[in-house]
């Protein structure tokens, strides 16, 4: 057995005797996150708070256009924190497509936790394009027969269209003296992070915590102990990373927030005074984009869907 596989049976045995917010077998399809999902279940059982709702919200295009034979409608399903970026990019793409093809593209947009969005697409939300937090979520849609195998080879960077790293956002002046991952396990620290059941970003947060132990010489037992202790400091689990930010920034809960660094930079660009630390031991947060083959063929939107995906690069 590999280093990652050895503790799997032990952790699953623990899981069978404890209550969980999500089933372990529901995580087995995550690419490269099989063991992490199992350990995460154990850690979440220690969380002191409840979960947020897991519904996603569908939003109309910024500038709706009445349907006509000259219009094409494209449905984009994405994870929560990409909303601001897409709302800036989409009008530019619409303008370019109109100029090049004399056709107006009308976007339907849906944003929510990556896990929730994945389930919605599999359950019938007819996305033409999906931009999700994890390659494993895209692979779930592939396994459901909606995306053709090899999707990651059809575009640059193996399908990865956005990247970031994990950042620790603190209160002004950093009163808890947060310097690195290990500080999140202090009894006096309350941590805000999203719900891994519904948020791909929250799974990346977990990977950051886990990786901080493994990359500094710890083994799986130490990593499990650490993440379990950290999750005891989590009072509430919002449904996605954007809601986690609101819980921390607008509702004033918690001493520290784990979030994407690009989200923090966006807040600063909007005039927010945000203090944060990027831990030295970190993880590359890679977010894939893919055309949903079955749906674009049904809708007759393959050309524009592929054009939009290429435009994102």
Question: Model segments located where?
Answer:
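Ligand-binding cleft/hinge of the Venus flytrap
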Residues: 91-101, 182-247
